[in-house]
Amino acid sequence: MAVVEAETRVFLEVRRRLQSALLILGEPDEGGMNLDISVTPTSLLMRSPDGCTEIRLPAGVRLAPSSCGGLQYISGDGLHLRLRAQAESSPQPISGFNQSLQAQECCSFYCQSCGEVTIKDRKLLRVLPLPSENWSALVGEWCCHPDPFANKPLHPRENDCFVGDSFFLVNSRSDLEQEPKANTKVICKRCKVMLGETVSSETTKFYMTEVIVQPSEGSFPNIPRSQFVQSVIARCLVELCTARSTFRFTIQGQDGKVYILLWVLNSDSLVMEPLSSSGCIRKFPLLEDSLEADSGSAWNAIKVLYQPCIKSRNKELASSWEGDISVHPLTLPSTTCLELLLILSRNNASLPLSLRQMNSFQLWCSHCKT
């Protein structure tokens, strides 16, 4: 095939379950030249008068060139075509908390923004997942006798850590000089960022987007803030979709205000997006904050539709979602909710134009570690 391009943006998405691939060859910013494109089972080859560029597919991914179909040109976006594809299955998601922390380990809690130690050298004898936020109501529905857990909240003991959907609960009695009051904010001493809040005089809730938990012998990992927030939220969504078959979520602040509506489309995508230019391959902005690997790498992705709910936008839709028991709320600090909205907007702007919206929703395509 031949198209007129000056600098071609290549976007490839492989759906593992559907065994299909979408290939988008973008339009040049300005000018143009003849470009011949060949699709082989393991690579994309682009030839121009100035040279030849080959983009190799990652191991385990194969295309079927003879299955090319749905060829169309979309103005402002480029050439689209669909093919049959095969990709190895991705590993099952593992709790990101348990990847780096196991019971019996001595660990420390750090402020993710500045690296300040919040809890130092805490030996955790039990690391336990919490039930869903509505577990008490479910007990009342299913039990034929009075609820034995009524008015008995779950509080961790001194060497416990309870893991919720978007937070950790730890016993803070031994780390504080004076007994704290319930329902007060926990602020980082160095950068003054809100890390969590006290649930009771002995229990502190730390939000997963604000702290990093590391074994004490390890060092503080310096991860860019936007990359960290994206990965935490993406991991939470994948785990909840897998465990509870829940696909719609609200992102709300600790004050109960809804900031974002999320609707998970799929988490089985493999995305590859280099930018080719006269014999070289380099990263495209969608990957710059997400990966440290080379530009030829592919990444597991979760695709999520979202709607902002700030400044009274989508007020009726947000209200209807809040009243729907199939919609799961995720609570974060209000400042992080606004930060996440900016991250989603920037991510959306880096996608091919035709993929940025679906009906009235916008698309977020995030790197998802497994």
Swiss-Prot record:
Pfam families: HECT_2. The modification N-acetylalanine is found at A2. It comes from the Eukaryota. Residues 214-236 are annotated as: Interaction with UBE2C. It is found in: Cytoplasm. Residues 332-368 are annotated as: HECT-like. Its main location: cytoplasm. The keyword Transferase applies. Keywords: Acetylation, Cytoplasm, Metal-binding, Transferase, Ubl conjugation, Ubl conjugation pathway, Zinc. One of its GO terms (cellular component) is cytosol. Ubiquitinated by UBCH10 (E2 ubiquitin-conjugating enzyme). Signal peptide: none annotated. A motif (BRAT1-like motif) lies at residues 129-159. GO terms for biological process: proteasome-mediated ubiquitin-dependent protein catabolic process; protein autoubiquitination; protein monoubiquitination; protein polyubiquitination. The C-terminal half (AA 188-389) is able to bind cyclin-B and shows a self-ubiquitination activity (mono-, poly, or multi-ubiquitination) in a HECT-like sequence dependent manner. The BRAT1-like motif mediates inhibition of the endonuclease activity of CPSF3 by forming hyrogen bond and hydrophobic interactions with the active site of CPSF3: Cys-144 coordinates one of the two active site zinc ions of CPSF3. Interacts with UBE2C/UbcH10 (E2 ubiquitin-conjugating enzyme). In vitro, interacts with cyclin-B. E3 ubiquitin-protein ligase which accepts ubiquitin from specific E2 ubiquitin-conjugating enzymes, and transfers it to substrates, generally promoting their degradation by the proteasome. Independently of its E3 ubiquitin-protein ligase activity, acts as an inhibitor of CPSF3 endonuclease activity by blocking CPSF3 active site. This is E3 ubiquitin-protein ligase E3D.
